[in-house]
């Protein structure tokens, strides 16, 4: 399925693809196995919420275009459970970005009365949720690249799927001028609401930025810089929009990259005038 999704992105073939149905079947297998494993009766499930797999998320003529695959009808038929889907389009039609979806879930699961808390999900793209637990309005946005640039660089230069625990990046040095150049991108300075995608922060984006400085950098140092970019842009997004934040918790695949976490801690010390609790959501039991 991962290869199918990549081919869809590369070839720009979306809902007419067989993968639209295949993903629905895949989701149904996961759900059916989960219910069976935990002895949960289907009649006790009110509905399945499915937002699908995003294959394109762009802006054109100041209009957000967000396309997901994963057939809700197939999922419903294979599980015999009602499915609620296409969450993003209603938000887009009402002036929103259609992403990220995570804040509602994060607020429900991680809200703690009085806590000044932000939740960071590091997937391909990083998104931040600012919770309502301190009389705030719930909001969130994409802070920038998460794993996408790191993973693509590691794949191209080391033939690995990802930098395990951030070990390669840890053994190299961040290139300060290159990081500054990355951070000059207009997205990092745009006000929320805002969202982005791996179509924007892509191999092409990285290649163009490397060309600007006309320097033959060490592969490991570029990787270290990309890791710092993820960490720094997250902390900048929090510090610029939630100065009273006391707690930051990280989830998603990037939470396993110890170097991202370490660089986030270092960046937080520089941006905040107080001690910030920074940990993964594992410490909250999730």
Annotated model-derived regions:
Residues 46-47, 118, 221, 247:
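Structural motif
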Residues 41-44, 113-115, 242-246:
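Short helix-loop-beta connector
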Residues 1-17, 137-138:
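Short glycine-rich, Thr/Ser-proximal phosphate-binding strand/loop in the N-terminal lobe
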